[in-house]
Amino acid sequence: MAIIDGIALAAATKAEAAQKVQALREKGVVPCLAVVQVGENPASQVYVRGKVNDCAECGIESRSIHMAETATQDEVLAQVRALAADASVHGILVQLPLPAQINEKAVINAIPPEKDVDGFSPVNVGRMQIGEPCYLPCTPAGCIRMIESTGTDICGQNAVVIGRSNMVGKPAAMLLLEKNATVTICHSKTKNLREICAAADILVAAVGRAGFVTGDMVKPGAVVIDVGINRGADGKLHGDVDFAAAAEKAAFITPVPGGVGPMTRAMLMLNTVQAAARQNGLAYRKTLQPVEIAHFQSIFIGGHVPTMKIPLESKIAFESPSGMRT
């Protein structure tokens, strides 16, 4: 069993973004991400700080707009529309959840598709469903990159996604389907859940219940991606997967913390850079130079630590954009 190191993979992904930022800056384009937070949710504050730090690491300009808990929907919409009209802002992210008086869908819908770097707007969701150019939701896109980092060929694999949320479960299933996996989506009404999961070559857990996936639900040799982030009574973060039990059977597994979370933010950086390029009539023509980093941690002391090759761009040129899919 090997742990997929999301921190190392995210670092390589952000290095890729930083190279693209440098190339854009040489063209006079400074990528900019605006993050709108409404209220004092402690978790949201942590997430926003993380995104601001990631931007700084990649050379992306960031704007953090913090609105009062009592802000009205009209005030939030006005802020989003102002950012939408600002040509120097290339990506807009509204940190969720929002206070009860604000309609989240209305706010997300107000973000122009070309600046929707979270990939949540109806236009981007619809484009993804039919395979058209779009910005992919960051968490599902990060999951795909993590699976592929193991050397697993997704094509033809039996993939099971537990959870059908609009932000993770459904888009993760669509991206796996696009990679030619045979996909099953499981949810609270699914019968024979244990048997279905135990047949999965790729198992993505996004149900929001700590330890929901037990060892007997994991097929020997499977790739297990744990999207869950649950705060336990001990104050620690726990995933949706019983890590110790699943690790005995999986070939590859993501930890919590240090797995999917860092990759979500890294994919946001890539989407933001791509948005800046697109909005300035530029797209990347890539010359790829693989860079090796250690990304798996063997749980066996003294065990072999495999490496992966992340294709970073040794040269970046520009051409007219043909689509936004990343």
Whereabouts are the PLM-identified features?
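Short beta-strand elements in bilobed, periplasmic/extracellular small-molecule ligand-binding domains
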Residues: C55-E69, V183-I185
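Anion-binding alpha/beta catalytic cores of soluble intermediary-metabolism enzymes, centered on
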Residues: L93-I154
